[in-house]
Amino acid sequence: MDVVLFTARDGALHVLLVATGSPTPRDRWTLPSGAIRRGESIDDTALRIARDALGTAPTHLDQAGMRGGARRTAQPVVTVAYSGLAPVGTPARAGAAWLPLSEAGALAIRDRDEIDRSIAAIRARIDHQPIAFRLLPDVFTLSELQAVYEILLGRPLHKASFRRSLHAAAIVEATDEWRTERRGRPAQLFRYAPPRRRRHRRGVRFDLLG
């Protein structure tokens, strides 16, 4: 099983890698992986692998797919992949590192393929699951939320359209807290509004936000 963990750092998406000890540059780093133990569900296995790699539990973890074929041994295997998220600012523990996604081309083909599949899985679910909020603290500004959506989607979003879509989807609620941003203007803080607080569950229409 492979676990592809992402976070946002310096305005870009990063993926967590673990050192292999291999002298070959392309195989020096790889995705966190492991085998399913006896009596363990695949969800439990993914969580264990993620915890071992991160040093803490991810804030989002979901199955991204599976594929057959030879992996790291000569025997045919079925590899299950999970994608996960860690909050902004999560450090890499000893023996691991956060690699900018733009540099993933230096990895082995099998790892690049898993990363691509995991990103596609996240983007397919982002408009109907609170995935973007898993990268943020409990309260945040709308600018911070938009930045996270842009990082995950890999494209810019129109500010006014983004906020109208958030309002229509009713997925955030205002708090009484404010924070001064870079330009010195106070910005109101918001929090994620769980489904039980919403009268409807409309998704965020990103096809309208170009």
Residue positions per predicted region:
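Active-site segment of metal-dependent pyrophosphate-handling enzymes
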Residues: 1, 14, 43-47, 51-92, ...
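Long, intrinsically disordered, low-complexity Ser/Thr/Pro-rich regulatory/activation regions
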Residues: 174-210
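NUDIX/MutT-family hydrolases
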Residues: 81-84, 91-126, 138-143, 148, ...
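Short helix-coil junctions and helix-kink-helix linkers
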Residues: 147-156
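Short histidine-centered catalytic/ligand-binding loop motif
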Residues: 31-39, 134
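Short, well-ordered beta-strand micro-motif
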Residues: 5-7, 17, 83-85, 189-191
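N-terminal strand-loop-strand
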Residues: 1-29
